[in-house]
Design a protein with these regions (language model features):
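N-terminal secretory signal peptides and thylakoid transit peptides that target proteins
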Residues: 1-17
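Short active-site neighborhood of thiol/selenol oxidoreductases, capturing the structured segment around
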Residues: 48-59
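Structural micro-motif
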Residues: 104, 108-119
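Non-globular targeting/processing and membrane-anchoring segments
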Residues: 10-14, 25-26, 30, 111, ...
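N-terminal "domain-start" segment that seeds a small globular fold
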Residues: 25-42
Length: 156
């Protein structure tokens, strides 16, 4: 293999690896921690005088991905207490009463039928702000989210 062809091959491989890495990082940036113990997660949120935000998501939901990527993941990385519960997911989780259940059972208990849905929980696992259902108004999603967080904080 000539030096020119070898250099061209390495250049193309580098571009491909760089693009793959950027794609993987953008996907990683759009994740939220899965709820595992709602009592513990709520306790931590309340210590910081903040409602616990629970995003109900569904695998493959484009609106969910957009809400995570544009708003929720950056907020969570900045310290806002946000966890995710997935519809149709049998992953175990402790509910607010400390009982073992699944993500899917929680979504049914909370009567969530639209994704994404954001719920804002305060003391005792009670909802302290109006739910945000859907993400079909992207220009207003951020202001609506900030309003719900303020509503939740006021109720604490």
């Amino acid at each position: 293999m000539s030096d020119l062809r070898r250099r061209d091959w390495f250049l193309r491989a580098g571009v491909l690896l760089g693009a793959t890495s950027a794609w993987a990082q953008s996907g990683a940036a759009a994740t939220l921690p899965a709820a595992q113990s709602l009592p513990d997660e709520l306790s931590q949120a309340l210590k910081n005088k903040h409602p616990l935000i629970v995003m109900v998501s569904l695998d493959g939901c484009g609106f969910c991905h957009r809400a995570r990527q544009s708003h929720l993941s950056p907020m969570q990385r900045a310290g806002t207490p946000i966890v995710q519960v997935d519809m149709r997911n049998p992953q175990p989780v402790l509910d607010f009463a400390g009982k073992l259940t699944t993500h899917d059972q929680l979504t049914r208990l909370w009567k969530v039928s639209i994704t994404p849905t954001l719920l804002f929980f305060g003391p005792g696992g009670k909802e302290v702000a109006e739910r945000m259902e859907g993400a079909y108004q992207p220009d207003f999603y951020g202001p609506y989210l900030e309003d719900r967080i303020a509503q939740g904080r006021k109720a604490l």
